Amino acid sequence: PVFKRELDWLNERLANFPEGMLEAAISHFSSLKICLVREITGSAESGSVSRANGIQFMNGTDAYIVLAAGDTSEKALYHELYHVMETHILGNSIALDQWAKLNPVGFEYDYDYLANAQRDGSEFLQPDTRSFVDTYSMSYPKEDRARIFEYAMTAGNDSLFAASPLQYKLKMLCQGIREAFGLKKSPENFLWEQYL
Protein backbone atom coordinates (compact mmCIF):
# COMPACT_ATOMS: atom_id res chain seq x y z
CA PRO A 1 0.00 0.00 0.00
CA VAL A 2 2.82 2.48 0.77
CA PHE A 3 4.51 1.87 -2.58
CA LYS A 4 1.23 2.28 -4.49
CA ARG A 5 0.40 5.45 -2.55
CA GLU A 6 3.79 6.96 -3.38
CA LEU A 7 3.44 6.04 -7.07
CA ASP A 8 -0.05 7.55 -7.19
CA TRP A 9 1.29 10.70 -5.52
CA LEU A 10 4.10 10.92 -8.09
CA ASN A 11 1.76 10.37 -11.04
CA GLU A 12 -0.59 13.10 -9.78
CA ARG A 13 2.26 15.63 -9.71
CA LEU A 14 3.68 14.60 -13.07
CA ALA A 15 0.20 15.05 -14.57
CA ASN A 16 0.61 18.82 -13.99
CA PHE A 17 2.81 19.01 -17.08
CA PRO A 18 1.41 19.23 -20.63
CA GLU A 19 1.61 16.10 -22.73
CA GLY A 20 5.06 15.64 -24.24
CA MET A 21 6.78 18.26 -22.10
CA LEU A 22 8.62 15.91 -19.75
CA GLU A 23 9.48 13.63 -22.65
CA ALA A 24 11.11 16.60 -24.41
CA ALA A 25 12.92 17.55 -21.20
CA ILE A 26 14.46 14.11 -20.80
CA SER A 27 15.26 13.70 -24.50
CA HIS A 28 18.76 14.96 -23.68
CA PHE A 29 19.37 11.92 -21.47
CA SER A 30 19.21 8.15 -21.93
CA SER A 31 16.62 7.96 -19.16
CA LEU A 32 15.22 9.68 -16.09
CA LYS A 33 14.96 7.66 -12.92
CA ILE A 34 13.03 8.99 -9.91
CA CYS A 35 13.88 7.35 -6.59
CA LEU A 36 12.01 7.84 -3.31
CA VAL A 37 14.12 7.31 -0.17
CA ARG A 38 13.75 7.87 3.58
CA GLU A 39 16.39 10.60 3.82
CA ILE A 40 19.26 12.26 1.99
CA THR A 41 22.38 13.17 3.94
CA GLY A 42 25.70 14.67 2.95
CA SER A 43 28.82 16.05 4.57
CA ALA A 44 31.12 19.05 4.35
CA GLU A 45 33.91 16.67 3.30
CA SER A 46 31.94 15.77 0.19
CA GLY A 47 31.21 19.44 -0.48
CA SER A 48 27.51 19.05 0.19
CA VAL A 49 25.01 20.22 2.76
CA SER A 50 24.23 17.89 5.65
CA ARG A 51 20.60 17.23 4.64
CA ALA A 52 18.54 17.66 1.50
CA ASN A 53 14.93 17.10 0.48
CA GLY A 54 15.96 16.13 -3.04
CA ILE A 55 18.92 15.86 -5.37
CA GLN A 56 19.39 15.54 -9.10
CA PHE A 57 22.49 14.01 -10.60
CA MET A 58 23.84 12.27 -13.67
CA ASN A 59 25.28 8.78 -13.91
CA GLY A 60 26.68 8.47 -17.39
CA THR A 61 23.87 9.65 -19.66
CA ASP A 62 21.11 8.75 -17.19
CA ALA A 63 19.49 11.50 -15.11
CA TYR A 64 18.40 10.72 -11.57
CA ILE A 65 16.10 12.50 -9.15
CA VAL A 66 16.20 11.30 -5.56
CA LEU A 67 13.50 12.53 -3.18
CA ALA A 68 13.27 12.18 0.59
CA ALA A 69 9.69 11.12 1.25
CA GLY A 70 7.74 13.46 3.51
CA ASP A 71 6.04 16.82 3.72
CA THR A 72 8.58 18.62 1.52
CA SER A 73 8.75 16.06 -1.27
CA GLU A 74 6.32 17.95 -3.56
CA LYS A 75 8.52 21.05 -3.64
CA ALA A 76 11.61 18.86 -3.92
CA LEU A 77 10.13 17.00 -6.90
CA TYR A 78 9.39 20.22 -8.78
CA HIS A 79 12.77 21.68 -7.85
CA GLU A 80 14.71 18.67 -9.11
CA LEU A 81 12.51 18.30 -12.21
CA TYR A 82 13.34 21.89 -13.05
CA HIS A 83 17.04 21.01 -13.04
CA VAL A 84 16.31 18.29 -15.61
CA MET A 85 14.14 20.67 -17.65
CA GLU A 86 16.73 23.44 -17.60
CA THR A 87 19.02 21.58 -19.99
CA HIS A 88 16.24 21.71 -22.58
CA ILE A 89 15.31 25.32 -21.73
CA LEU A 90 18.85 26.66 -22.06
CA GLY A 91 19.30 24.86 -25.38
CA ASN A 92 15.99 25.97 -26.88
CA SER A 93 15.33 29.49 -25.57
CA ILE A 94 17.30 32.68 -25.06
CA ALA A 95 14.94 33.95 -22.34
CA LEU A 96 17.33 33.08 -19.51
CA ASP A 97 20.47 34.45 -21.17
CA GLN A 98 20.16 37.77 -19.32
CA TRP A 99 19.17 36.26 -15.97
CA ALA A 100 21.92 38.07 -14.02
CA LYS A 101 20.42 41.43 -15.01
CA LEU A 102 17.32 40.59 -12.96
CA ASN A 103 19.39 40.53 -9.76
CA PRO A 104 20.08 43.57 -7.54
CA VAL A 105 23.02 45.73 -8.62
CA GLY A 106 26.25 44.34 -7.18
CA PHE A 107 24.76 40.96 -6.23
CA GLU A 108 26.86 37.86 -6.94
CA TYR A 109 25.93 34.21 -6.48
CA ASP A 110 28.04 32.20 -4.04
CA TYR A 111 28.83 29.38 -6.51
CA ASP A 112 29.42 27.20 -3.44
CA TYR A 113 26.79 25.38 -1.36
CA LEU A 114 28.82 25.42 1.85
CA ALA A 115 29.59 29.14 1.59
CA ASN A 116 25.92 29.76 0.82
CA ALA A 117 24.89 28.01 4.03
CA GLN A 118 26.75 30.77 5.93
CA ARG A 119 25.31 33.67 3.92
CA ASP A 120 23.07 36.31 5.43
CA GLY A 121 20.94 37.30 2.46
CA SER A 122 18.28 39.14 4.43
CA GLU A 123 18.79 42.40 2.50
CA PHE A 124 17.53 40.64 -0.66
CA LEU A 125 14.54 39.00 1.07
CA GLN A 126 12.57 42.07 2.17
CA PRO A 127 8.89 41.69 1.22
CA ASP A 128 8.59 44.78 -1.02
CA THR A 129 11.88 44.32 -2.87
CA ARG A 130 12.35 40.56 -2.61
CA SER A 131 14.69 39.28 -5.33
CA PHE A 132 15.02 35.66 -4.19
CA VAL A 133 12.83 32.96 -2.68
CA ASP A 134 15.35 32.35 0.10
CA THR A 135 19.07 32.36 0.85
CA TYR A 136 19.58 29.00 -0.90
CA SER A 137 18.46 30.71 -4.12
CA MET A 138 21.59 32.84 -3.87
CA SER A 139 23.95 29.87 -4.24
CA TYR A 140 23.83 29.43 -8.05
CA PRO A 141 21.67 30.81 -10.89
CA LYS A 142 20.33 27.29 -11.49
CA GLU A 143 19.21 27.04 -7.84
CA ASP A 144 17.59 30.47 -8.06
CA ARG A 145 15.52 29.34 -11.04
CA ALA A 146 14.72 25.90 -9.57
CA ARG A 147 13.58 27.47 -6.30
CA ILE A 148 11.31 29.89 -8.19
CA PHE A 149 9.85 27.00 -10.20
CA GLU A 150 9.17 24.83 -7.13
CA TYR A 151 7.33 27.65 -5.37
CA ALA A 152 5.46 28.61 -8.54
CA MET A 153 4.20 25.02 -8.80
CA THR A 154 2.85 24.85 -5.26
CA ALA A 155 -0.06 26.53 -3.49
CA GLY A 156 0.01 29.39 -1.01
CA ASN A 157 2.81 31.52 -2.45
CA ASP A 158 0.94 34.63 -3.62
CA SER A 159 2.73 36.96 -1.21
CA LEU A 160 6.13 35.58 -2.22
CA PHE A 161 5.64 36.59 -5.86
CA ALA A 162 4.08 39.98 -5.04
CA ALA A 163 7.47 41.75 -5.10
CA SER A 164 8.37 43.12 -8.54
CA PRO A 165 11.93 41.67 -8.74
CA LEU A 166 10.75 38.11 -8.07
CA GLN A 167 7.75 38.61 -10.37
CA TYR A 168 10.10 39.61 -13.22
CA LYS A 169 12.17 36.49 -12.63
CA LEU A 170 9.04 34.33 -12.69
CA LYS A 171 7.92 35.96 -15.96
CA MET A 172 11.32 35.33 -17.53
CA LEU A 173 11.32 31.72 -16.38
CA CYS A 174 7.80 31.14 -17.73
CA GLN A 175 8.78 32.74 -21.05
CA GLY A 176 11.77 30.40 -21.31
CA ILE A 177 9.62 27.35 -20.59
CA ARG A 178 7.02 28.35 -23.20
CA GLU A 179 9.71 29.02 -25.83
CA ALA A 180 11.71 25.87 -25.15
CA PHE A 181 8.77 23.48 -25.09
CA GLY A 182 6.78 24.94 -28.01
CA LEU A 183 4.06 26.39 -25.79
CA LYS A 184 4.24 30.06 -26.88
CA LYS A 185 0.89 29.96 -28.67
CA SER A 186 -0.93 27.80 -26.13
CA PRO A 187 -3.89 29.62 -24.54
CA GLU A 188 -3.58 27.39 -21.47
CA ASN A 189 -2.41 28.85 -18.18
CA PHE A 190 0.00 26.31 -16.78
CA LEU A 191 0.43 25.59 -13.08
CA TRP A 192 3.83 27.30 -12.92
CA GLU A 193 2.16 30.48 -14.24
CA GLN A 194 -0.44 30.71 -11.47
CA TYR A 195 1.31 33.66 -9.78
CA LEU A 196 1.82 35.82 -12.88
Cite the ranges covered by each PLM segment:
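Active-site-flanking segments in enzyme catalytic domains
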Residues: 31-196
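Zn2+-dependent metallopeptidase catalytic core
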Residues: 1-31
